[in-house]
Amino acid sequence: MLFGKRERAIKRVLIAEDEPLVAFDNEHSLRDAGYMVVATVDSVPAAVARIAGGRIDLVLSDVNLSDGGDGRDVARAAKAHGVPLLFVTGACPADARALAIGCLLKPYGPRDLLAAIEAVEATLAGRAPRRRPRGLMLFDGD
């Protein structure tokens, strides 16, 4: 820790989002905040392939992906590889608690997205989040 700042445990993020504007905004916000966006994909097969390739600290996934893809399949792949997933979606699926660390409901702004990632990181480390943005539900450590 240097000057009160913790080293981030979440550095490399995969974005699975089929809405181009949302995907672009998320990618831009994360990069500006110092995260490495491993990839931005819009389909289940592309997300699963990236997850299987390793070196991802967090997946941000919409539930509805292109070609009728289901983000819950992305969540299952992430879970199988030990990678936490945060759903970023308009409606949190009923089975989300079994698949993900949490849900951030759309619409959300860049500050809320970054605060949600910080809250996920705190939760994974066993700490209480400093701030929970509106629309964020966390399933571990609730």
Where are these regions (language model features)?
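Conserved acidic carboxylate
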Residues: 17
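Active-site residues of response regulator receiver
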Residues: 62-63
